[in-house]
Amino acid sequence: MKNIRNFSIIAHIDHGKSTLSDRLIQHCGGLQAREMEAQVLDSMDIERERGITIKAQSVTLDYKAKDGEIYQLNFIDTPGHVDFSYEVSRSLASCEGALLVVDAGQGVEAQTVANCYTALEMDLEVLPILNKIDLPQADPERVCEEIEHIIGIDATDAVTCSAKTGIGIEDVLETIVKNIPSPAGQIDAPLQALIVDSWFDNYQGVVSLVRVINGEVKKGDKMLVMSTGQVHQIDKVGIFTPKQTDTGVLRAGEVGFIIAGIKEIHGAPVGDTITISKKETANALPGFKKAQPQVYAGIFPISSDDYENFRDALNKLSLNDASLFFEPENSSALGFGFRIGFLGMLHMEIIQERLAREYDLDLITTAPTVNYEIASTNGDVISIDNPADLPAINNIEEIREPIVQANILVPQEYLGNVITLCIEKRGVQKDLIYHGNQVAVTYELPMAEVVMDFFDKLKSTSRGYASLDYHFIRFEAADMVRVDVMINGDRVDALAMITHRANSVARGRLLVDKLKELIHRQMFDIAIQAAIGNNVIARTTVKQLRKNVTAKCYGGDISRKKKLLQKQKDGKKRMKQVGNVEVPQEAFLAVLKLDS
């Protein structure tokens, strides 16, 4: 027990977490040189292509320290992006310490601060590590000051290293051994193990990553999952070195995996407690706060035959991704599909990509919206995440939109651009503090503005230097309206959007113009209108294609031409009554790309 060290690596995006973990694995001989590859822990293709970590991964390494003892290091590589902060908090719950990795060239960024506070709230020992020390622009003294000023932890003994070249890796390992406390827990107590993560393997069933708090778990034990009350026999117990390695037993303080041939997908929910069915523990461990979805979108299979496969795919993904929320939805334009809740736009993109790649599905996605609170005239308060569910205007007392508190760290020279952007997005400034060259700005912004394209715009106005961290604070009444789109007088439910009244005319105008480009011309005029209630705020017409019916009349009588033109006109009129308009897939995505 006293030689076990459990820790996580936390950092902002691109500060070198995954590379540092590669070096630690290499140094401790977890993999042979030929098996080593860059970002060995980023197991999904998407993670490698985008160069981001999405899922937390765990590794157990043996390290022979300078004092001659052999230490067992269990470490968890965590994501850095704001959308995946719940993954970070889950990883931290199974550790006693955390390495706070900061890029020695870039310094402290918003996500570093947010993840570090999460670790400090859980009473973890946080060790600052300055990475990328080999870069010419590295400035360790300035960064140490930033760590002390902005985060408020002592950085005098911060370890400097370069994960890329391998300088200072030994110092990092020694610091871990010296400063991170060993786990507390009794091996002879009844088993208590926390499920940190789980995923579905087509051959083995559910694989659970667990941290054993008390007791020990062996192959062949009968384990009880406390929330479901079901008992399963354990087939395999072991650790990741990053390869799956069977050890037959896990004792208090260790992190490893358990496979018990659980076939139903939600047999071992994340955050649950496992115990042995014969001598069970009296109380379950406190689990994790369920991550609340912030953005909702309707996703529909292009072919209705895929509906069942789509549902299975979502079930399997939601096991691996505890924050995914979904419920069936029916749209008159797109048929049957699901309303899915995500943590942010990046999360939504990743899930769409995983559905397309891993499950081979062709899907249409509607415009994402956030969750609104509606106070109706009869005193009820309902919450809606789909514009189509908004009640009639005369039944609504007020619409409340979610407000987030955004903490932005930005270099002084880009402060003006960032403030202008926040004002455009209807933000209210709450705080502004100078730390050397960095400025910490706090704004309250409507969540709908933040989740759409705020992050991209923030990066482009500050040339990539500003960083953002945000969290929900409250609902606030606002003058929101639903803009409906009508094509030849028929409402298309999948194109409706909720927006602020001040932006509604501009957005309605943009949307109908965009649709005009995307909807193919027919034999009759197509009227595209944007309306609030019965009030049309923008309209455009896709002109008809028409044949020149008088071409074959040469010379002569005007009444003959009139007769042919009248006949064409009557035909078009009949066609318009029965004809229906195909709305192409790109039109549903047009709503996403509206840039107000």
Curated annotation (Swiss-Prot):
It comes from Colwellia psychrerythraea (strain 34H / ATCC BAA-681) (Vibrio psychroerythus). Residues 2-184 form the tr-type G domain. The keyword Transferase does not apply. It is a peripheral membrane protein. It is an enzyme of class 3 (hydrolase). The keyword Repressor does not apply. PANTHER family: TRANSLATION FACTOR GUF1 HOMOLOG, CHLOROPLASTIC (PTHR43512:SF4), TRANSLATION FACTOR GUF1-RELATED (PTHR43512). Keywords: Cell inner membrane, Cell membrane, GTP-binding, Hydrolase, Membrane, Nucleotide-binding, Protein biosynthesis. Its EC number is 3.6.5.n1. It is found in: Cell inner membrane. This is Elongation factor 4. NCBIfam families: lepA, small_GTP. One of its GO terms (biological process) is positive regulation of translation. One of its GO terms (cellular component) is plasma membrane. Belongs to the TRAFAC class translation factor GTPase superfamily. Classic translation factor GTPase family. LepA subfamily. GO terms for molecular function: GTP binding; GTPase activity; guanosine tetraphosphate binding; ribosome binding; translation elongation factor activity. GTP binds at D14, H15, G16, K17, S18, T19, N131, K132, I133, D134.
